[in-house]
């Protein structure tokens, strides 16, 4: 018979208890891990909601603000500079409400090539939020992703660009999980889906009862950015909005990728029923020397309807697109380009529906939808013009 002293027995018991407690804590830690599959189909695991975040595109502030509208910048330790340079109107709104936005370190400019891994690692980030594709690092930047994850920075991919009407909901739910804001994410998703149904369901009913001609649409992207006529979107981005409302995108059969060029001769031959331009100009462009400014269409934060209309008139005049039948017949419209990269895109979908099928959607009010999105889910007020119809009478005066 083996005898064990009381002292050794106590040590043994303590060891066993410690071992068991370690196992319990390990199991609890495992159970509390946040585990999701991102939109690059990668398994992403966090031990706790992210507290130090890198934004691969600072335009994702729209999404983060939905989850934390009172303090959207609190956990952001670094971001690309795209919002300030590409959408200065919105940046100025944030700057006025949250002056500390200027103090957030920039980890790059407006491209993946400018993204600084070294800068990110110096900021002790625990999560980097990237788009599957876009201005910042994407899913194809395997080496960069590997560098970050080896250094302990978890990478999460979201998407408002490639398949926006499917992936906006998925992206917001992912962000809700990793940031510990599921309730806010669910509230947004509920509103978003209800507003999408206001397009999808009436359109399906109308098509079933009275099959109608799908309008041929030319989607003119980033008007004024280059002299060459005319950049367009064929797949994803705003082309996906067009697909969702049953529009016939005339670029789809001519452009093999997501974006490309259709020349003016082709447009004059095909003569789309509807012309939609995307506007990359901002209020700040109006403050500069107009004579030296490209013919941007100006829309977005801080832009009046009259200024938007004047910029649209100028862009049409300088591009020679006034000869399009759609323009002459009063079926020419412009919309804020950056809808394609934010979860506020549902307002743009409703606008497209109303432009293509005005009778079916006579009672739909996209402006009210956008107002609600800002009132419920954004930290800054809706203040500006985000779409406009070309005033053909003004053009002939």
Regions found by a protein language model. Give the residues of each.
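A general, composition-driven signal for non-globular sequence regions
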Residues: 1-5, 19-22, 266
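Bacterial N-terminal signal peptides that target proteins for export
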Residues: 2-14
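Bacterial N-terminal signal peptides
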Residues: 11-23
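N-terminal ligand-binding lobe of clamshell/alpha-beta domains
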Residues: 27-397
């Amino acid at each position: 018979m083996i005898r064990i002293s009381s002292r050794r027995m106590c040590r043994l018991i303590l060891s066993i208890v410690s071992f068991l407690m370690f196992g319990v804590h390990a199991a609890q830690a495992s159970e509390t891990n946040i585990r999701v599959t991102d939109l690059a189909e990668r398994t992403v695991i966090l031990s706790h909601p992210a507290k130090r975040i890198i934004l691969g595109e600072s335009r994702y502030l729209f999404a983060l603000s939905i989850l934390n509208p009172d303090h959207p910048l609190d956990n952001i330790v670094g971001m690309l500079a795209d919002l300030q340079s590409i959408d200065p109107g919105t940046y100025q709104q944030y700057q006025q409400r949250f002056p500390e936005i200027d103090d957030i370190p920039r980890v790059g400019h407006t491209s993946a090539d400018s993204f600084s891994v070294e800068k990110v690692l110096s900021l002790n980030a625990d999560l980097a939020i990237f788009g599957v594709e876009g201005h910042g690092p994407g899913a194809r930047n395997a080496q960069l992703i590997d560098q970050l994850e080896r250094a302990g920075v978890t990478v999460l991919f979201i998407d408002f660009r490639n398949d926006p009407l499917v992936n906006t909901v998925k992206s917001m739910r992912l962000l809700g999980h990793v940031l510990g804001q599921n309730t806010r994410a669910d509230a947004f998703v509920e509103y978003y889906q209800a507003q999408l149904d206001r397009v999808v369901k009436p359109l399906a009913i109308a098509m079933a009862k009275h099959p109608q001609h799908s309008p041929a649409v030319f989607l003119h992207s980033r008007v004024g950015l280059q002299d060459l006529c005319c950049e367009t979107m064929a797949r994803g981005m705003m082309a996906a909005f067009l697909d969702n409302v049953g529009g016939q995108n005339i670029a789809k059969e001519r452009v093999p990728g997501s974006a490309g060029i259709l020349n003016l001769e082709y447009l004059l031959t095909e003569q789309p029923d509807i012309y939609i331009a995307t506007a990359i100009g901002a209020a700040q462009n109006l403050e500069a020397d107009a004579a030296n400014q490209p013919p941007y269409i100006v829309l977005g934060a801080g832009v009046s309807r009259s200024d938007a209309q004047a910029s649209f008139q100028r862009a049409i005049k300088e591009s020679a697109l006034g000869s399009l039948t759609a323009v002459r017949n009063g079926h020419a419209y412009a919309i804020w380009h950056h809808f394609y990269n934010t979860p506020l895109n549902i307002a743009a979908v409703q606008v497209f529906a109303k432009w293509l099928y005005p009778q079916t959607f006579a009672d739909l009010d996209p402006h009210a939808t956008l107002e609600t999105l800002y009132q419920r889910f954004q930290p800054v007020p809706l203040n500006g013009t985000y779409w406009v119809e070309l005033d053909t009478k003004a053009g002939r005066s």
